[in-house]
Amino acid sequence: MSFSLNKIQKGIKREPRKIIIYGPPKLGKSTLSGSTKNALMIPTEDRVAHIDCDKTPVAKSYADVMGVFDVLLKEKHGYKRIILDTLDWFEPLLHEYICHEKGFKSLTDDHNKETANKKV
């Protein structure tokens, strides 16, 4: 890395922070996340009804989740924190979307591995 004085960053660089809270079930991760100010929860499982926070209907597909993000990007709102709850329930939605888009039976299909590893 070459360095010069004009590469010095002054002050605070404002960027969105990304946080993942990981732990065993029933620890209170969703409750903690939902208790933050100006938060919107995007649930991917139907286990957050007891949490007192703003939340979308349960996302049943990747398109549901992306639809929420699309609206949040286009429309004015006061949310400062977006909570995707939970990532382990979102992962199969993402896999399903990728398989549908790519015509794969599954992400672990041997043919897909060969196709994915080919250089284009």
Q: Can you describe what each PLM-predicted range is?
A:
Residues 89-120:
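P-loop NTPase motor core
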Residues 2, 6-96:
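Conserved P-loop
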